Amino acid sequence: MTINGWIQILVFCGIIILLVKPLGGYMTRVFGGERTLLSPVLVPVERGLYRLAGTTEREEQHWTTYAASLLLFNLAGFLLLYMLQRFQGSLPFNPMGMSDVPADLAFNTTASFVTNTNWQNYGGESTMSYLTQMAGLTVQNFVSAATGVAIAIALIRAFSRKSMKTLGNFWVDLTRCTLYVLLPLCIILTLAFVSLGVPQTIGVYAEATTLEGARQVIALGPVASQLAIKMLGTNGGGFFNANSAHPFENPDAISNMIQMVAIFAIGASLTNVFGRMVGNERQGWAIFAAMGILFVAGVAICYWAEAAGNPLIHALSVDGGNMEGKETRFGIAMSALFAVVTTAASCGAVIAMHDSMMALGGMIPMINMMLGEIIIGGVGAGFYGIVLFVVVAVFVAGLMVGRTPEYLGKKIEAKEVKMAMLAVLCLPLSILGFTAIASVIPTGLASIANPGPHGFSEILYAYTSGTANNGSAFGGLSGNTPWYNITIGLAMLMGRFLVILPAMAIAGSLVAKKAAPQSAGTFPTTGPLFVGLLIGVILVVGGLIFFPALALGPIAEHLAMIKGQMF
């Protein structure tokens, strides 16, 4: 580890902390229907969209109606994207003549982008036409991110409102997030990326002659615009197969820092939106502190593991850390930081090959996802994910002091705890269930590239990434097979919607409750005691169940490596 590496990490953390309050304040005004700088331009567009949808901004929805609207919207998007891939060979904006996508891969890709996962069992520059990239994948990058934010806002309203039956309007929240938050920020990011050298074209691929006289085709496309929402919406699906390790997606250290900041910007700021909407910003900062402590701990361990390198190589008097699978223009510090950032949020973009990381270095991204990606998390998804743990934490606190659990004056009763645990337990059900099956059947084992614990880690990482809606992978797993396309697709759908529905049920229950005044026995939820309790609950309830699987994978691999055995 170097001072330069830690300075880069501290600069990133400082930028995020400085962004939380201004961006949080702006989003609070947007979802509160207040006037913003963009209102003169966007209000007419917003109202026109409401008229087309047959709704108004004043129309409110019960939680069941809100959830039904969300599910119908996502179903429509699923069908449209699937059909677009299946018939892309006959559609325009296909200058390179890409063929129709096979059914199992189209299902996997559709589930991936609709759920904000962006798991890719294909190479973007060799599989998808420009039309599919722009009208299919990029559109889902926007609306899947906006869907996550809408759920988070509905859940926040459940705490800020008292004795009501409605949580807002899904169509209004979706529209406002897209128009006022995602589009303006993406335009700024797109211009920044283009200025740094990222391509933005719908022309044919370029041709070049190498120094040896060979002909080389250089893939191009509308990269910058997709890159912007890929990062801001924590989608992660790359235009190119190499993702953000490709120089056309990530030319230099400046673009790399911008991309990492974009990944965390909205998720971190939602904690401030929460504090503002419930009338106590310290509540938001407490949640942000818990996220931040877990994040910094993960970065420190991952950076240490990668900087320490392989002990078997140390015996050859080679020092310099583990540079395998990393870009020299980024180095170990930025590669480790990016790996933790992309898995702490449900992004999945990569600048280094996670499969080439040291056993403990690769375990940290896996743990981030196993916790439900609530360390900042995806846009919206991270916030409503950590609120589920907040519900469990205050329930535990209530049991310890012998009082009915309360959070922000709302009583946390059996229904809320059951729904929270249902959502929390769906992750291990999917991850461990699919991993167990794939680890014993020939179809599952045929796709792994390495024997022993590392091969098991490849399978475990794949289902963890899919269920947690991340999308990154251990590249040694050949995932483009009918088995993995279908099962990982199902894991992605389970990880998205089996968490959303319990979260919406909790919101519907809480919004109808009165807020009790604070008393001397009320458990404080803005101090270090609550932050520590929340972190403990996250690690014990969310993480401990995965320890046996981790022991069979990365931990066993690390111990074997110490003894001189590699896989």
From Swiss-Prot:
Record's GO cellular component terms: plasma membrane
The keyword RNA-binding is annotated on this UniProt entry: no
Taxonomic superkingdom: Bacteria
Record organism: Brucella anthropi (strain ATCC 49188 / DSM 6882 / CCUG 24695 / JCM 21032 / LMG 3331 / NBRC 15819 / NCTC 12168 / Alc 37) (Ochrobactrum anthropi)
Function: Part of the high-affinity ATP-driven potassium transport (or Kdp) system, which catalyzes the hydrolysis of ATP coupled with the electrogenic transport of potassium into the cytoplasm. This subunit binds the periplasmic potassium ions and delivers the ions to the membrane domain of KdpB through an intramembrane tunnel.
Name recorded for this polypeptide: Potassium-transporting ATPase potassium-binding subunit
Family: Belongs to the KdpA family.
Assembly information from the UniProt record: The system is composed of three essential subunits: KdpA, KdpB and KdpC.
Main subcellular location: membrane
Gene: kdpA
GO molecular-function terms, A-Z: P-type potassium transmembrane transporter activity; potassium ion binding
Its membrane topology: Multi-pass membrane protein
Cellular localization per UniProt: Cell inner membrane
Keywords in alphabetical order: Cell inner membrane, Cell membrane, Ion transport, Membrane, Potassium, Potassium transport, Transmembrane, Transmembrane helix, Transport
Residues spanning the membrane: 5-25, 64-84, 136-156, 179-199, 254-274, 285-305, 332-352, 359-376, 421-441, 486-506, 529-549
